[in-house]
Amino acid sequence: MALPKNLIPMPRSRFLRVKCIDCGNEQIVFSNPATTVRCLVCGATLVEPTGGKGVIKAKILEVLE
C-alpha cells in the first residue's frame, strides 16, 4: 500500500508583496483577505475579498514563502 507524499498538506494561501499602481508604494498583503486591503499611503484599493482568493488590483512583485 503506497503512502501519500504529503501527509500534511501545505496551505494554498500566500503573502504577496504588491506595488500600488497609483503611488508606487510597496506593501505586503495576504492572498485571501477577509476585508478590503487599502494602500497605506494613498488609500487606493489593493485587494478585494471574494470569499476565497482575493481580487488583486495591484502589481504583484513577489510571492513570499
Swiss-Prot record:
Zn(2+) binds at C20, C23, C39, C42. Gene3D superfamilies: Zn-binding ribosomal proteins. InterPro entries: Ribosomal_eS27, Ribosomal_eS27_Zn-bd_dom_sf, Ribosomal_zn-bd. One of its GO terms (biological process) is translation. Keywords: Metal-binding, Ribonucleoprotein, Ribosomal protein, Zinc, Zinc-finger. A zinc finger (C4-type) spans 20-42. One of its GO terms (cellular component) is ribonucleoprotein complex. Its cofactor is Zn(2+). Coiled coil: none annotated. GO terms for molecular function: structural constituent of ribosome; zinc ion binding. Disulfide bonds: none annotated. Belongs to the eukaryotic ribosomal protein eS27 family. NCBIfam families: PRK00415.1. Part of the 30S ribosomal subunit. This is Small ribosomal subunit protein eS27. The gene is rps27e.
